[in-house]
Amino acid sequence: MATIDVVNLSGEKVGSFELADEVFGAVNEDLLWEAVKHYRAGQHRGTHATKNKKLVSGAGKKLWKQKGTGRARVGSIRSPLWRHGGTVHGPQPRSYDYAFPRKKLLGALRSALAAKLADGKLTVVESFDVKEPKANAFRKTLAGLKVDKTALLIESAENKNLELSSRNLKGVELVAGNAVHPYHLLRYDRAVIARPALEKLQNSLKKAASKRHAEVA
């Protein structure tokens, strides 16, 4: 069982944390791709719309009689055959979301955490004990934690000072431990997670992995 250093907000080592092999194991890139695809599909607004024959402006009156004019027969000026007529089979508002198995999602989350660990981009802090909600001060704190690009902050409970300190920092996002998604971990360069949040997340993922192995056996 591997371990990872636990540091304080000053970057000083204050302990270590044991990482479960069931969680921080092999990386399944195919599963990560599926999870990211599903997440982005859910984010798609799907508000695109074109005007069909029913919605486009114009009267429905027949332009000229069916026979006797020598011209091609025609119905409404809103016909798709006419300029400014309705669009046929054009995009309409819809949801792009689809069902994604929970087992796959948890497996992808394990792979995302394992990938961050393998890349040396996972930092565990004892706690996000932010004294004052100051963005500049917190930016220096992140620099001390070797965050030089984008960062995902994972906290176990509501932390108002942390929220206020990080919300205006470019490239920094704060999420709760029970709401973290593989997409979040892959999107940001470094993940900084509080020890209590990692404990809860690891226990949850470890339990799910053990249950899956029991079903297979």
UniProtKB/Swiss-Prot annotation:
Transmembrane regions listed in the UniProt entry: none
Keywords: Ribonucleoprotein, Ribosomal protein, RNA-binding, rRNA-binding
Cellular component aspect of the GO annotation: ribonucleoprotein complex; ribosome
Residue runs in coiled coils: none
Molecular function (Gene Ontology), one example: rRNA binding
Superkingdom, natural source: Bacteria
Gene Ontology BP terms: translation
Keyword Ribosomal protein: yes
Matches recorded under HAMAP family: Ribosomal_uL4_B
Recorded family membership: Belongs to the universal ribosomal protein uL4 family.
Stated role: One of the primary rRNA binding proteins, this protein initially binds near the 5'-end of the 23S rRNA. It is important during the early stages of 50S assembly. It makes multiple contacts with different domains of the 23S rRNA in the assembled 50S subunit and ribosome. Forms part of the polypeptide exit tunnel.
Quaternary structure and partners: Part of the 50S ribosomal subunit.
NCBIfam families with a match to the protein in the record: rplD_bact
Protein name as catalogued: Large ribosomal subunit protein uL4
